[in-house]
Amino acid sequence: MACCHKVMLLVDTAGVSAPHSPARRAALRLLTYLSCRFGLARVHWTFKFFDSQGARSRPSRVSDFRELGSRSWEDFEEELEARLGDRPPGAHLPGPTPRATHTHGALMETLLDYQWDRPEITSPTKPILRSSGRRLLDADGEAREAQAALGGFGNAVFLLAPCPHSQRELLQFVSGCEAQAQRVPLTPKQVMEKVLPKRVQEVMIARNITLYWVDTTERSKLWASPDHVGYWTVCELLHHGGGTILPAETWSLGFTKARETVLPCGGELSHKPHPSPWISALPIDATVNCLLYNSEYEASFPRIEGTLFLPVQGKEIEETWAISLEPLAMHQRHFQKPVRIVLRGSVAQWSLPVSSALGTDSWMLQSPEEHRSTQRLLFQELVSRLTAEEFHLVASVDPGEGWPPITGIISPFSANAMILTVFRAKEAEFQSHFLQTAATEGSQDTASLFSDVVDSVLNQSHNLFEDPASSAPCVPEWVQQELSHTSSWSPALVEKWFPFSNASGATSDLMESFWLLHAASPDNDESSKTESELTRCLSELYQRSHEESTVVNQERSRKKRGIPRTPVRQKMNTMSRSLKMLNVARLNVKAQKLHPDGSPDTAVEKGLQKAVIGRTADKLEDRGRILRSSKLKEFKTEEELLAYIHDNYQKAVATEEITLYSCAQNMVSTIKMFLKSKDIKELEVACLSHVNSNLLKTSKTLRQNLAGKMDTEDKVGECQLQVFLRLEMCEQCPSVLDRPDEVERIVEEVTDLLRLVCLTKDSAYLSEFLEEILRLYIGSIPGTIGQLYHSLGLKIPQKLAGVLPTGFFSDDSMSQESMSPPPSSSTHRSVSAITESEQLEELRTRSAKKRRKNALIRHKSIAEISQTLRQIEVPKVSKRATRNENSHSASIQLPVPRKDTIQEVTKVRRNLFNQEMLSPSKRGLKKGLPRSHSVSALECLHHKQDKFKKTKSSTFQGYCKLLTKSVAETPVHKQISRRLLHRQIKGRSSDPGPDIHVVEESPEKEDEMTLRRSPRIKQLSFSRTNSGSFYSVSQPKSRSVQRIHSSQQESEQRENFPVQSIQSPKTLLFGALSEIPSSSKKGSAQIKRSLRSMLDSEISTSYETPKKSNQKSPSFSKTTPRRFPRTAQTLLYTPERLQNSPTEMTSAEGTISEATIKTPSSHGYNSPFASKVTSQKTVSPAKEETSPPLTKLPSTPRESDVQPPQCSSDCTWPHSVNSSPEGPYYPASPPPMAGQARSQCLTPIRYSFRTPPRTALAGTSKQQEHQELPLPRASQTQEPPQGLEKKALKIPKKPAHTSTSPLSPEEHYSGCDVSPHQPRNSLSASPPPGELNWKEHQTSPSVTSSVSCPVPSTPPRTPQRMTCPIPPSPPSKLRRSCRKKSCPPQDFPECHPGPSAAPVLSSATSPGAVTGSREEQSQFSEGQSYLGTGFRSDCHVSSPVLTASDTKCLPLIDEAQLHGLKNQEVKSGILPGEEGEEPESTIADELPSVSDPGILVPAPSSVSSSSELLPYPLCCTADGKQRQDAAQQGSPRASEATSSPQTYEVELEMQASGLPKLRIKKIDPGVLLEAEALGKEAPLGEEGALPALCMPKASKSSGRTEHPYLSPPCLRPSHSTPGKNGGQTFICQSCTPSRCPPSTPSPFQADAGVSWTPSPKQSGKTTPEIIKDWPRRKRAVDCSAGPSAGRGEASMDLPGSLSLLEPEPEGKERSLEQDLSKVLISEEFELEGVCQLPDQSPPKDSASVTEETSWGQFGLGRKRFLSAKEESEYKVKRVCDSLSEDPQASKQKECSPRWSALPLHSVGDDEVFVSGSTPPSGCMVRSCLSASGLQALTQSPLLFQGRTPSSHSTDTRDEEVDVFPSTAEESPFSHTLSRKRPFRTYTRKKLIS
């Protein structure tokens, strides 16, 4: 209400005699005044009539408050006339009831009948966005501001009625007929009780209402009043309530006749009483202001004391009166001290002289109230005498302080006040004239003084008027002419209108013509046609100019420039994200059909152009004014110029008074002026060289020069001045803008300077500075500012995006990567691959072309400019060869290949359509279909390398931190250019800290081959990398995943060495990224390689695993203690289950296992201890050993938990990883063990997950904690968080594994010699890096559950291979486990990914779940704080349900989620770069845990697992998938190995034909064990891939629980293969399911501070249901991808998955076709930020295809994809998982066919999907790798012995559904997931429609 004033006019018709009575005039003037003061929109008014004399009249209409306007005023006049007309004769006679009673009754009705306190309809609950300052005010702040600004004027009742003036009238008013009998005067209290009783006062106070009485007494009655006691009594009463009386004269001013205000010069006195001319001389507004805001105005018109000397006859001593003087105008000169006023004489008929030569100041004289009453009476008597005689006194005013006396005239003003008019010094002659006259009378007494002075002064006065000097015109001639026509001009009019008119060029002739026009009668036809034509033309001209100005103002005031606010958009803002995305997609499809040519609606463009032109013009005009005002000096010599400039420069830096902007502008302008040249270009070139040589300093120079010399403020000021100088160069020398290289150089320098500023100032300061830059330069050089934002990795603000050219967001401009692959790279592709890729390329370019025209043709109702740019790079050449070489080369080689594509970007724009941008290393990855690749920036921290094992340091020059990742599969419009990446990295490099390297990661793992592996393992990893057999391998790691890997590594390092990374500007700007990367530092080299070869999911897995290991190990450790006490028992009872838990808990082991799987021969079997120590990455041997230990450890989860060695192993593992960054780190060797461990852990983890839904939660907490550690924002203990962070980061990688195989965590633990108990220890060590995780596990059973959860996660991963089917089962088992552990509720909730977010919340909510949830939340909050809001939410999705769902949907969701996450992240406020990458990575960290839970049971654990798994899920984007694949590759093997003695490795290989080929290899038991260990890890990785995918989904789901829905279709197979193939993954920004978050109010999120409901931004990313639906099948296949996608990613992943699938289809035709159709549609939507729904291909088919592809890769999707060997491997993995989980998996499969593929995975995946996507697409579970799907895979004959594989695509779904139902039986999550999935299905159909 503070924003709007409610005004009620309460009109007493008894005092109204005629329609044009004072009441009407007062009402009109009052409303005019209010509207002028507050604005028409801020005043709402209404009126009410009553009769104070009791006369009956028709009831007054009660209309609500309305805005001021002519219509409402007409209503008032009509009602007034009707009442006056209806009034019967005699109605004016007073009745028996007193007037006060009627007035009181009317007042009470007014207060009670109207809604004074109703809020504005337009903004019922929203804070008002003030136009000034553009800041949001809450209700209290708004009220306070309104009070301050409006002087307390809130709501008001204006009582328009005659006010009693005399005491007798007051008596009659209060007592009515009794007044005759009552002679006793009324006391104020009696009057108050009658007029304003306490009840009325209370109501007024409660509603902030003030009562003002507008006196409408007729003037004749006013003068007839004998006294004014009644008036002052009423006035005093009103003052108590803040009101007052507004006198009648206030409203009649300006309407008086001339003879009443100005006496004629004849000297004949008017016999009619009239107010002082002074009253009419005061402007009405000023009078009303003074009355309404008395206290405020008193401050503006300060009173001073004075003394009035009256000469007394016969006395030398003059009588003195104390008086107070109050200025009448604010601008007049004030007296400095008490003033002496001496009366000299008197004058009659004096009026203010109208003379330009006469200057006057006016003061009001009053007798101070505090002085004795006798003096006041005398003063009043003097005033009344002067009024009666109409005399004025002449006085000499002595201002003191040596100033000469001044002549003044004292005039009567009111009953107790006079006006002193002082003539200023220039009227000396006039003053002396008066003084001489007055002096002659000085000796007479006061009485005679008056009469005598009158005579003399009258003569003086005649002389005065005749005096030509004094009569000189004081105003222009035309004004005199106007005044001569009429004397009725009011002072207000003269004061306001004439000056304005004069300034506008009015002349006598013009005014004369106006008079002539006015004089002509309306019906006179003599007016010439030309006159009328002129009038018409003038009116048109004025109207047009007015309209144009209005348009410009509207443009300026529009909040979102260039984006029309349509009813549809307004409506959609209130929808859930999923619905919104659905409708956007639907409308966009319509728009595409309407504009097939891609021509966009031009309305927006035109509006934009107009706005830009208008703003540019304004900018130029403003600049012109500034330049004119700055009076540029002219210099004769260059030395003078330089001296002047140098002087100015120093002053600007030294003093804060000079604005740096104006100083820079002035200096550049001065130089330009000095270099006068006729040729503009020459001038600009000379000016630039001058500025460059004399003014500009580089950031390096500044850093060196300012090192110790200046204080921080000066440093910052100089940096800012340098920024302004460069921007001014661009602005004032436009020719610079024609040279892109120069602009780029300038932008880079500005970026460096801003980073320098960040060394001493926080990010908020930088934001303010950037806003200032934006405000100053948006109109002139928006493109340069846009590049600056890109360079900083910041999201482009809406208002800047509105003015940027459309080409700015296209690949050609900003997204071009500085390093494009050599053309020769294309030769790697086979002919068939080229054909397929050409088809895809055609699709890409077609969409890209449309995008360039206006990206996607959006329905005009929702058309808006896309902001987020991510680069998806699609390598033209298959990356396989390169990856394989890199893989073989060793982890150390990984960095080298990565260097080819070293990108320096904080935020990477993924170029989905630009294959040229791929680096050679990525190009060769997939030969069939070019798979998108990821580029990651690694920060090598030399100082950290000492703290960590140097295995990696040798590779990456020390501990490497994964800073950024670029995923090739991201739509172009969401990509960040490589140039940006380089710039950002460069910027980071400017920091004396770590070196930054770019690690390119492609879905294909080129580096994988580099690892020393047995051919079989190589093939497995290769298939994973290329075909994404287990999404971890095939799925490109998302940047987030990479980050998480790096974070995990860093976490491991931290675990080993709990030292928090140093905070630097880099940390500030890219903290999230760098933090996670820091975890990766150990695995940084690995990551680099891993990122590349991570495409060989192994490294990914390994990387992630190690991180996860660190994170998860500790996480699991911690989880295990908490949840694992039970879980431990369970684990003890069920070694497999135990393993699962430990695996999840021991992310490092899982990672190691995965690594072992990848390089089983080299590392996996070499040194188990090393593996443990080295963490998955370095632990090829360690992994092998680890795997067995893991297997054993799972048996003794508690032991594992308790084992400090585990923790140290975990920590050591990262070191180990460092030691052998390339080889060991590479999961190549470790994978076997990882597989083994994974398998072992898978089942246990599954069980754990089952039991551990809480554990998952706890794990999630733990993971979150770990994540926190990596995250600079981590809220938990810094050091432990660091450890946790490392762990979390590792865990995230592990989560990828975990998601792949919940075993992964256990495996990690095993690998790290950490049994479930040991993981607890690890967690315990989390405070130290390792201990924290362990502690967390111990701390929260939930965490343990979380650990368990990862196991299910692992199964999904295994499904990729063998684990996938198993994971579903494990989820059931996990649930059972949870129940067994007395955590069923938790397990149930967490295991209910199917139900989607809700289940997750449920699980979190359950006691265990809550514990895990809280722990996870805390961790999560850290991670989330790191990730940002979006990620937190996502991570929180870690609830089991989400995880399971995630697992399933991971691939697709991974991508979608990744994008969604990025988007969320951005929305969350993370830097775009950080957002895109860090969120993924962080999500990976946290999501892994979620992913694990994503495995249904793992869902709770999933949080923890998600953390580990998440990296891979996050990887779901091409990049994320690559990482996930990498992680999963290693991980799946591990899970396989772990699961069963007979292990089959399924390798998805991209054939030359472009079709993916599944290779199923049989792994010997030893390898299998290793694989199992790795598999457990891989399951974490693989299910991590699935669950990880799931987890990312879950993770995102936590941010937005929707992810689970989306990912499945794109899971590992499609995601991995396509991604690796370079296929583009469409990321459905808008597809991010919002369902998950809303449905999962898990305690995790609550604790983490992350909303379980999707954040608005997250919601915005909700994947349309349709999109989610079709990919769902594929996602089921792409279980891991799904989880990776996470909810944000899920949405994008649908398209992204599709695109991934597409790329995979390049490798795999079957997948390709469906993908293509999806991609086509996706692409178009992609432009919109929403994947287009595949109209062409049936959603389910597409999903199926993708699913099959994914499953094929996973071993779950399609049987055809699973070669016997691969299926066997999957089986093996699954067997391992299913050892414990199998029954449940089967149950899940049986229960929900749909979940069959998803069951385990389903928990997270579906949950994620459910949560992530409002549509039931989640329900469809994408059939990627749900927990059930994993189980189905596990059970499938191919994948598992004794198990029939469920149909990979359709069956997988069915199995998944079945498994899920079984899961559902076990846990409500399953059922919930089931329900949600169907919903998703419907959504998908809707989208297609």
UniProtKB/Swiss-Prot annotation:
Its biological purpose: Regulator of DNA replication and S/M and G2/M checkpoints. Regulates the triggering of DNA replication initiation via its interaction with TOPBP1 by participating in CDK2-mediated loading of CDC45L onto replication origins. Required for the transition from pre-replication complex (pre-RC) to pre-initiation complex (pre-IC). Required to prevent mitotic entry after treatment with ionizing radiation.
ATP-binding among keywords: no
Location(s), subcellular: Nucleus
Domain of life: Eukaryota
MF GO annotations: chromatin binding
Lineage: Eukaryota, Metazoa, Chordata, Craniata, Vertebrata
Subunit composition and interactions: Interacts with TOPBP1 (via BRCT domains); interaction takes place in a CDK2-dependent manner. Component of the replisome complex composed of at least DONSON, MCM2, MCM7, PCNA and TICRR.
Residue ranges of the region described as Disordered: 812-836, 979-1063, 1098-1421, 1471-1508, 1520-1543, 1630-1714, 1730-1751, 1841-1875
Gene Ontology terms: cellular component: cytosol; nucleoplasm; nucleus
Protein name according to UniProt: Treslin
Organism, scientific name: Mus musculus (Mouse)
GO BP of this protein: DNA repair; DNA replication; mitotic DNA replication checkpoint signaling; mitotic G2 DNA damage checkpoint signaling; regulation of DNA-templated DNA replication initiation; response to ionizing radiation
Modified residues (Phosphoserine): 295, 599, 820, 861, 919, 934, 1002, 1027, 1078, 1141, 1406
Compositional bias (Polar residues): 1020-1050, 1127-1179, 1203-1219, 1525-1543, 1652-1662
Record PTM Phosphothreonine, positions in chain: 1134
Listed Low complexity bias regions: 812-832, 1187-1197, 1339-1351, 1496-1508
Listed Basic and acidic residues bias regions: 1705-1714
Basic residues: bias regions: 1373-1382
Keyword tags: Cell cycle, DNA damage, DNA repair, Nucleus, Phosphoprotein
Similarity comment: Belongs to the treslin family.
Annotated PANTHER family: TRESLIN
Keyword Cell cycle: yes
Pfam family, one: Treslin_N
